[in-house]
């Protein structure tokens, strides 16, 4: 049974989160959590929370056994960017894009 968990508008760019997502794709859930625990990136914490949510969803909604679960799919899409202005010299201004991302984790016991 496939179970999905999503984190929308995560405050990190999709490019940075994809680096972490690639580490756990296809792994067993226990191994993926261990990998994320020792990954020294902000995105690892975001992905870990979504993975734990997917595990809880599978256990509660589908009655799945945690030991059989695998990360079948994990993908990161770009979310909306917040536009900000950085004042510069001589009355100019630069645009700052604070990027967000949508993290989706799918776990399955197959």
From Swiss-Prot:
This entry carries the following GO cellular component terms, namely: cytosolic large ribosomal subunit
Q: Which UniProt keywords apply?
A: Ribonucleoprotein, Ribosomal protein, RNA-binding, rRNA-binding
Segments passing through the bilayer: none
Q: Which InterPro entries match?
A: Ribosomal_uL22 (IPR001063), Ribosomal_uL22_bac/chlpt-type (IPR005727), Ribosomal_uL22_bac/org-type (IPR047867), Ribosomal_uL22_CS (IPR018260), Ribosomal_uL22_sf (IPR036394)
Query: What GO molecular functions are on record for this protein?
Result: rRNA binding; structural constituent of ribosome
Task: Give the UniProt record's GO annotations in the biological process aspect.
Answer: translation
Q: Which SUPFAM superfamilies match?
A: Ribosomal protein L22
Q: Which family does it belong to?
A: Belongs to the universal ribosomal protein uL22 family.
Function summary: This protein binds specifically to 23S rRNA; its binding is stimulated by other ribosomal proteins, e.g. L4, L17, and L20. It is important during the early stages of 50S assembly. It makes multiple contacts with different domains of the 23S rRNA in the assembled 50S subunit and ribosome.
Assembly, in brief, is: Part of the 50S ribosomal subunit.
What is the name attached to this protein's record?
A: Large ribosomal subunit protein uL22
Species of the source = Yersinia enterocolitica serotype O:8 / biotype 1B (strain NCTC 13174 / 8081)
